[in-house]
Curated annotation (Swiss-Prot):
Organism in which the protein naturally occurs: Halobacterium salinarum (strain ATCC 700922 / JCM 11081 / NRC-1) (Halobacterium halobium)
Sequence positions that bind Zn(2+): C334, H385, H510
Cited function: Catalyzes the attachment of threonine to tRNA(Thr) in a two-step reaction: L-threonine is first activated by ATP to form Thr-AMP and then transferred to the acceptor end of tRNA(Thr).
Keywords for the protein's UniProt record, in alphabetical order: Aminoacyl-tRNA synthetase, ATP-binding, Cytoplasm, Ligase, Metal-binding, Nucleotide-binding, Protein biosynthesis, RNA-binding, tRNA-binding, Zinc
Gene: thrS
Cofactor binding note of this UniProt entry: Binds 1 zinc ion per subunit.
One Pfam assignment: HGTP_anticodon
Name the UniProt record assigns to this protein: Threonine--tRNA ligase
Highest taxon above the source species: Archaea
NCBIfam families referenced in this protein's UniProt entry, alphabetically: thrS
């Protein structure tokens, strides 16, 4: 029998028989590990412990102590949900039920569910878990599998697509339930300590709006009930912080039906925040030596064919015909920047050339995937591109790392860093990939950055450094990125004249400090719970006259505060009501002015933490405001 070589996480290797399973490898390593095996990772892909190994690979054993265990548990929980739904609605047609970052879902056809249904499904699922049913993998002949799903066109389509082939197909069973599935799963339903059905939504089969409409049932699961309750508490807090809710309450943005899906309108308050965000990175770009450029929203599709986007992204592009010529709204800014570079004549002494643009782009996401500002059709990227010599990459990346770290620290966002390396399908020589990955590693190591390596997760055109950050609720988001690109310079024939007077191709560096403004704005709304730092707040100071007799002085105080965003509360309300309203509006500072303050040419300062300081000299407050805003401090601190 032939053998294969498996490489373990520590770099050691084992020779095992071809066809041996992940579990067999675990037993080969040690009997204890074999008993504890839940699943495995083959070449970084999560697989069932029963998965056979037919070729040389890297392998990692997953136990209940592994980070991936939660994914496996939730995959089984999705089957528990499907089993409960089928018991409650025997006519329901099951489609797919994957695990997700926060739980799982199952898409079903031929049924609609209301709140009472969800309660009954929750109770049924609890019974299935209490029964501690064994979860077992079985294999069916392909013809038998098709016969099994004679009345389920969705499962038959999966058999003909993802599960296509000549061999048997795997199912997982638990009690009276079985489902077409490649795994992995835990050993029994009783391993699920906490289970909750969350909500439903509409979905489309295959994410295609032209296909069947389905009901998507969301749930989550954890090893313990206490883990579940902690999650549910965070989820309730997240609902209170939901940027869509706060966006309405604070008059930041709207997405009305009349404008179309995924096309946000920014109201004056929201635009104020976005303008401050833009001015901040504009200053950083200037310090780093970037020149601001601007490209149109619309290009001939010839540009997108040259860049490769037409081949890879045409289904996500908005296309239109103009005088029998095809144009496309830009899904990315980089081809425009490459074209600008190509319009010049460059020497090696001119490099690096750095461009940046707050560029609006358009991507046609499926309507069912659109959500507030997190997934939209039209969004703006703080896009930057560097055209550099290979020997300049390290210095450029180091400076970008410093700047990105400064940005995330400014907003008090915790972050993680990952180095994504060469994927199987890539462009560029081995030498330039090795050099580029080495340079990125050296930058990360020299700066003492704690980072993970994500093998094969780089873009096809070059390796990248990804920043993922966490908000105040501990949720993870994709953040800034630094990517090296060998593909676009080649496609656009970019060149510069080297010291040898020959033509050379520059390396292109893509970078974004925020990513999408929309996504970053959404994160900040929820991260701060609408309580923006003073420098970002749409209204920084509200002046509260005690009576109408103090209105004149209130306006004089406003004038003294110059260009700050200051409003005078002139409604005929009590001071208490004015203070409460300012708190509700998340205004950082309130200045109460009555006869005593007017006589002393002073103000009484209150902040949104409900602290108060009486008889404050206005010049003193103004000087502190200057310092707080210039320093971009995260909380009002005059009264500290």
């Amino acid at each position: 029998m032939s053998s294969v070589t498996v490489t373990l996480p520590d770099g050691s290797t084992l020779e095992v028989a071809s066809g041996a399973t992940v579990e067999d490898v675990a037993h080969e390593i040690g009997p204890g590990l074999g008993r504890d095996t839940v699943a495995g990772k083959i070449d970084h892909e999560l697989v069932a412990k029963e998965e056979p190994i037919s070729e040389d690979c890297e392998i990692e054993i997953v136990t209940d102590q592994s980070d991936e265990y939660l994914d496996v548990l939730r995959h089984t929980a999705a089957h528990v949900l499907a089993q409960a739904i089928r018991r409650h609605h025997p006519d329901a047609k099951l489609t797919i039920g994957p695990y997700t970052d926060e739980g799982f879902y199952y898409d079903i056809a031929n049924v609609e569910l209301d709140a009472d249904d969800l309660d009954e499904i929750q109770a049924e699922a609890a019974s299935i878990i209490d029964d501690d049913l064994d979860v077992e993998r079985v294999e069916y002949d392909r013809a038998d599998a098709r016969e099994h799903y004679a009345d389920n066109e969705f499962k038959r389509e999966i058999l003909d697509a993802e599960a296509a082939g000549d061999g048997p197909v795997s199912f997982y069973t638990q009690g009276d339930f079985e489902d077409l599935c490649k795994g992995p799963h835990v050993d029994s339903t009783g391993e699920i300590g906490g289970f909750e059905v969350l909500e439903t939504s509409a979905a489309y089969w295959r994410g295609d709006e032209e296909r069947e409409t389905l009901t998507r049932v969301y749930g989550t699961a954890f090893p313990t009930e206490s883990d579940l309750q902690e999650y549910l508490a965070r989820r309730e807090e997240a609902k209170e912080r939901d940027h869509r809710k706060l966006g309405r309450e604070m008059d930041l943005f709207s997405i009305p039906d009349v404008t179309g899906p995924g096309l946000p309108l920014y109201h004056p308050n929201g635009k104020t925040v976005l303008r401050e965000l833009s001015e901040y990175v504009r200053g950083l770009n200037s310090e780093m030596g970037y020149d601001e450029v601007e490209t149109p929203h619309l290009f001939r599709t010839e540009l997108w064919k040259q860049s490769g986007h037409y081949d890879n992204y045409v289904d996500d592009m908005f296309l239109l015909d103009v005088n029998d010529e095809e144009y496309g709204l830009k899904p990315m800014n980089c081809p425009g920047h490459a074209t600008i570079f190509n319009e010049g004549s460059w020497s090696y002494r001119d490099l690096p050339v750095r461009y940046f643009e707050d560029g609006k782009v358009y991507r046609k996401e499926q309507r069912g995937e659109l959500s507030g500002l997190s997934r939209v059709w039209a969004f703006t990227i703080d896009d930057g591109h560097v055209f550099a010599r290979a020997d300049q990459i390290e210095a450029e990346v180091r400076r970008l790392m410093d700047t990105i770290t400064e940005v995330l620290d400014t907003f008090d966002l915790d972050y993680e860093v990952a180095l994504a390396t060469r994927p199987e399908k890539s462009v560029g020589s081995d030498d330039i990939w090795e050099q580029s990955e080495r340079q990125l590693r050296e930058v990360l190591d020299q700066q003492g950055v704690d980072y993970d390596v994500e093998p094969g997760d780089g873009a096809f055109y070059g390796p990248k450094i990804d920043f993922g950050f966490e908000d105040a609720l501990g949720r993870s988001w994709d953040g800034p990125t630094v990517q090296l690109d060998f593909n676009m310079p080649d496609r656009f024939d970019l060149e510069y004249t080297g010291s040898d007077n020959d033509a050379h191709q520059p390396v292109m560096i893509h970078r974004a400090l925020y990513g999408s403004y929309e996504r970053f704005f959404m994160v900040l709304i929820e991260h701060y719970n609408g309580r923006f730092p003073t420098w970002l707040a749409p209204e920084q100071v509200r002046i509260l006259p005690v009576t109408d007799d103090n209105l004149g002085y209130a306006h004089r105080v406003k004038n003294e505060l110059g260009d700050y965003r200051v409003e005078v509360e002139d409604r005929d309300w009590t001071v208490g009501k004015k203070i409460q309203q300012a708190h509700d509006d998340n205004v950082p500072y309130m200045l109460v002015v009555g006869d005593d303050e007017e006589d002393a040419d002073a103000v009484s300062v209150r902040d949104r933490q409900e602290r108060e300081g009486k008889g404050v000299d206005l010049a003193e407050f103004r000087a502190h405001l200057d310092s707080e805003v210039d320093g971009k401090r995260t909380e009002p601190d005059f009264l500290d």
